[in-house]
Amino acid sequence: MKRHILSFFSLLFAVTITAQTLNVVTGNVTYAFPAAKVGDMTCTDATTLTIGGKVFAINDINKIYVDNSEVTDNEVTVIYDGSTASLTVAGNVAPYVTPAVSGAHVSIAQSNTADVDGNEITYTLSGTSSDGEFYMSGKYKCSIEINGLSLTNKTPVYSGAALHVQNGKRVNVSVKKGTENMLTDCSSPSEDLAQKAALYVKGHAEFKGKGTLNVKGQYKHAIKAGEYITVKNCSLNVTGAVSDAVNCNQYFLMESGSISMSGVGDDGIQCDIDEDADATGETTDHEDENSGNIYITDGTITGKVTATAAKGMNANGKFVASGGAVTISTSGGGEWDSDNVKTKASACISADGDINISGGTFNLTSTGAGGKGISGDGTFIITGGDITINTSGAIAYYSGGKISTTTSSQTTERLSSNYKSSPKGIKTDGAMKLSGGTLNVIASYHEAIETKGTLDITGGVIYAQSSDDAINSGGVMTISGGTVCAYSTGNDGLDANANLTIKGGTVYAIGATSPEVGIDAQERCTLTVSGGTLVAIGGLESGAVTTQTCYQLSSSSTSSGSTNGRGGFGPGQQGGSKTWTANTWYGLYSNGTLALAFKTPSSGGSALVVSTSGTTTLKTGVTAGSDTFWNGMGASSATNGTSATITTYSSGNGWR
């Protein structure tokens, strides 16, 4: 022993003379001390050796050597190589980390780092192991750098996760530029080692870097944080998960980078309010926020969610988007929720609170029974963005102790709303306000756009198509701006279960044959047209108040003699001939200037009612320009055409 100690002091002398690095090896761990930072060294009773504040049991030391390697302060490097892992610990943080290595299973307990110039420790992970893990515990901020890592945890030692940070503070997860990485957890851990995700952070996780991280959750979630998650620059690919692809509490923020999700057994991105902390709602700069909100400011999110009643993105609070590109499809059917006594269904985007979209591009597709594009329990506000939604599922309903499906509303009309889920493009319980952006919603069954509250449209380009009401509001509907096309093949174009007022904007409403109409307000409520540019196929409901003059196309202006339900020109009359020609472009003019070019559908209600704020004229057979919108049903320019005969429409000439 005396000879080993003398050898050590000889090495120490060499280090101090040549400014080299002193390396102390214990098992698979190397502690690297730069000469300038070795500090005081003591040997106690020939049993322990203290270097730079790190106490070593001499019997645990395998080797001490000197080399010319450079040491990066505050860094711990872990290299996986098959069934083994080797660690290098920078000397300045050696007193604050306690590693344990079993094969390729690595555990590190981190203690106070406040004495290390106030800096945090960075753990750099690289290499490959088909049976390994990284587990870190502590109470201080740290960074995890993933730099060419492929890790699968087959036989857990410390946790079933591939990467587990049992640390309630902020953890940076940096995926290094140009690297492709893979994390896979254990599919069947023991109960005491059962993990919450393949990549789990107890605190808040901030993902960054410009590399790619692939994650597969074989037991529960793929990625999970006990607090918030932010994503910036890096690419996260969830290739499979038994439960959610990404799960967190407090809030989720997508700033840049990309997330792709497939093969998940529940939701794509799930954000909950942390029940162990006080709920705060949204806060400035998200400081101390516990809202359950999902924020999208930039980046790309793609997801294919197939599970029953699953959500592409599900916020316990609000959903707020100001940018980015989101493409999500859901295909799962409905299920009965016995706890809440209701039928649940899938949705591409779902929020228990408000939904606010001011920018970004959204392509949402739902094909499962009862599925929706966007579903919210609060208010729904769109001021910008480009949103495309397609839903094609049937109705999911609970009867006779099981979930069934149907495409007929008559089958479920006697069931309470809790016992059925109807597929809709957008459905919200609170007020809806649309003032900007582009919204294109097509629903094969049931409403394309529906709010249980009021609907206020002041701007934006909106196209809604459905076999049910194209746009429906439970409360007052007001249109004072925007460019709106509501096209129903089986019901009303616009339908309010209260008063409905059109006082501005451009509106093209298409209703089905009798008894449906183009624009409809609730019985004993009032439809008022006081401004804007209006086209209504199927006409207006009986008793409409038209303070701006409306006109109806004369039957002599059409080449079609077929009957198509509603028509006639006397109060309450029905069953007259259709006054317009199908699949034909018309031009609506105000004071001689084109206000709107519109294409008629293949079928619809008999009457065609028009109105503008000036002297109104109509042409048939115009040639539309290339500047089409509304899914090819509207255009801003047109040429040619033949004048059509229109006659004044009065409130007495109702179509209902």
Where are these regions (language model features)?
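Sec/Tat signal peptide C-region and signal peptidase I cleavage site
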Residues: 15-19
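Compositionally biased alpha-helical segments
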Residues: 20-70
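Sec-dependent N-terminal signal peptides
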Residues: 4-14
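A composition-driven surface/loop motif
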Residues: 69-656
